[in-house]
Amino acid sequence: MATIAELKAVLKDTLEKRGALRQIKARIRAEVFNALDDQSEPRPPLCHENLLINELIREYLEFNKYKYSASVLTAEAGQPEVPLDRQFLVKELNIVEDANGKSVPLLYGIISHFLHRGKEESTQSTLPKVSLLSYPRQNLAKPSTERNQKDRIPEPGRMAGTSIEEPLVLQSIKR
């Protein structure tokens, strides 16, 4: 007859081989986070750029089946429960997708574009080089369409947004 220690070892090994142990641990971490999250303390509103960045990350996490990581990101960042529409993201980020690129997260296409840009010497979609020191703090009270370029420096702890003059053309990638 097997000992309790042997049964534990076999159970752990089986769960690891199936990938279930990793899922169980992630689920426990997400549940602990949700239990400890203080809902009474209001979160500061997300700036437009952080909302878009978080949405790109959420799309990536959900595509890769990191659902507990995505739920923690949504809760911790104060992201809306309902994901933003992909077409909205494409329009806001001034991205042009080819038909094959729609099957993977936008983040894959963005990364692929910049990894291969040097090889193809495209003048399209070059991010402007901006010195953050020369701009005042961002005016978050205005919608992003009303902010001018000098309002682009973020508050401490927030990411700076960049604007793309030409559309970012994403082509299909092999994953």
From Swiss-Prot:
Q: Using the UniProt annotation, give all residue ranges assigned to the region (Necessary and sufficient for homooligomerization and localization to centrosomes and pericentriolar satellites).
A: 1-104
**In this record, what's one Pfam family?**
FOP_dimer
| Region annotation Disordered: where it falls in the sequence | 137-166
Query: Its Gene Ontology biological processes?
Result: cilium assembly; microtubule anchoring
For this record, the Gene Ontology CC terms, alphabetical, are: centriolar satellite; centrosome; ciliary basal body; cytoplasm; motile cilium
Looking up SMART domains in the UniProt record yields:
LisH
Instruction: For this UniProt record, give its keywords in alphabetical order, as a comma-separated list.
Output: Cell projection, Cilium biogenesis/degradation, Cytoplasm, Cytoskeleton
Superkingdom classification of source: Eukaryota
Where does the record place a coiled coil?
A: none
Domain LisH per the UniProt entry, residue ranges: 49-81
Its subcellular locations are: Cell projection, Cilium; Cytoplasm, Cytoskeleton, Cilium basal body; Cytoplasm, Cytoskeleton, Microtubule organizing center, Centrosome; Cytoplasmic granule
Compositionally biased tracts (Basic and acidic residues) = 144-155
Its function, per the record, reads: Involved in the biogenesis of cilia. Required for the recruitment of PLK1 to centrosomes and S phase progression.
Q: How does it assemble?
A: Homooligomer; probably required for localization to centrosomes.
Q: Name the protein family.
A: Belongs to the CEP43 family.
- Identify this protein by name: Centrosomal protein 20
Say which species the protein is native to.
Gallus gallus
